[in-house]
UniProtKB/Swiss-Prot annotation:
InterPro entries: NAD(P)-bd_dom (IPR016040), NAD(P)-bd_dom_sf (IPR036291). One of its GO terms (cellular component) is mitochondrial outer membrane. It comes from the Eukaryota. It holds the Pfam family NAD_binding_10. Gene3D superfamilies: NAD(P)-binding Rossmann-like Domain. This is Protein fmp52-2, mitochondrial. Keywords: Membrane, Mitochondrion, Mitochondrion outer membrane, Transit peptide. It comes from Aspergillus terreus (strain NIH 2624 / FGSC A1156). One of its GO terms (biological process) is import into nucleus.
Length: 229
C-alpha cells in the first residue's frame, strides 16, 4: 500500500481527494498540511495544522511514513488573496516551493490540480493562466518519476461557489446532454476521484507517459465512467 500527502485539503477538489484517499484500500496512510484542519477523520489520517505556508514544503521530508505520492490542490482567488500579487505568491510561488520540496524528499508521483485552457491561444496573457503554466513547467523540469497535471474545466458542486451564476449554468447543462456539461465543467467529486485514479495508475506503472496531462475528457473517464471504489 501507498502513503500519500495532500496540500489544499480543505478546498473543493482537495477535500474530495482526501475523502477518496481515506476510503481507498490502496493508500495506507494520508498526511495533510493546511492552515486549518480538515473535517475528515480516519485512523490513517495525519493532519498537520500550519499557519505559516513557507513551512509547508519542509514538512514533507519529516513525514512518517514518507509519502510516495503528493497531491497539490492549493489555490485561491484574487479577491480572497487581496490582489493579484498575493494570489501569485500562493498559486505560483507556494506551489512551486511544495513541488521542489517533494522532489528533494524523494516523492515518486506528484499530482497537481491545474486548470483547463491554460495552454490556449491567449492564455499566456492571462495572469491566472500564467500562474498555472509556470507551475506546470516547473514540475516538468523537476523530473519526477511520474508527474500528473489535471486540467479541469469549471468546478461545479461546490458548497461555496466562486462564480455562482456561471457555475449554476454549467451545473444544469447536463439537461442538454451529459457530454455538453463534460466539455465545460466537472463536479468536484469527479475531479478528486480522477486525481486519485491517475496516481494509482502511475504507481502501478500504467501511466501513459512520465509527464501526464489529464484533460477534461480523461478526468470524466477516470473519475466517473471508469471509476471503481
Amino acid at each position: 500500500m501507498t502513503a500519500a500527502a495532500v496540500f489544499g485539503c480543505t478546498g473543493a477538489v482537495g477535500s474530495q481527494i482526501l475523502a477518496t484517499l481515506l476510503a481507498s484500500d490502496a493508500f495506507s496512510s494520508v498526511a495533510t498540511v493546511s492552515r486549518k484542519l480538515p473535517t475528515a477523520e480516519s485512523p490513517k489520517l495525519q493532519a498537520i495544522e500550519e499557519g505559516d505556508t513557507s513551512k509547508w514544503g519542509t514538512t514533507i521530508a519529516s513525514l512518517s511514513p514518507k509519502p510516495s505520492v503528493v497531491f497539490n490542490a492549493v489555490g485561491t482567488t484574487r479577491a480572497a488573496a487581496g490582489g493579484i500579487q498575493n494570489q501569485w505568491k500562493i498559486d505560483h510561488d507556494l506551489c512551486i516551493e511544495i513541488a521542489k520540496a517533494a522532489k528533494e524528499a524523494g516523492v515518486k508521483t506528484y499530482v497537481f490540480i491545474s486548470s483547463g485552457g491554460t495552454r490556449g491561444f491567449l492564455s499566456r496573457h492571462v495572469p491566472y493562466s500564467k500562474m498555472k503554466i509556470g507551475v506546470e513547467d516547473a514540475i516538468k523540469e523537476l523530473g519526477f518519476e511520474h508527474a500528473i497535471i489535471l486540467r479541469p474545466g469549471m468546478i461545479i458542486g461546490r458548497e461555496k461557489s466562486k462564480a455562482p451564476l456561471f457555475e449554476a449554468i454549467v451545473g444544469h447543462l447536463n439537461k442538454l446532454g451529459q457530454g455538453v456539461q463534460d466539455r465545460i465543467g466537472q463536479d468536484q467529486l469527479i475531479i478528486g476521484r480522477a486525481a486519485v485514479a491517475a496516481a494509482r495508475l502511475a504507481e502501478d506503472g500504467k501511466a501513459p507517459s512520465k509527464f501526464w496531462a489529464v484533460e477534461m475528457s480523461d478526468i470524466v473517464r477516470l473519475g466517473r465512467d471508469e471509476w471503481k471504489e
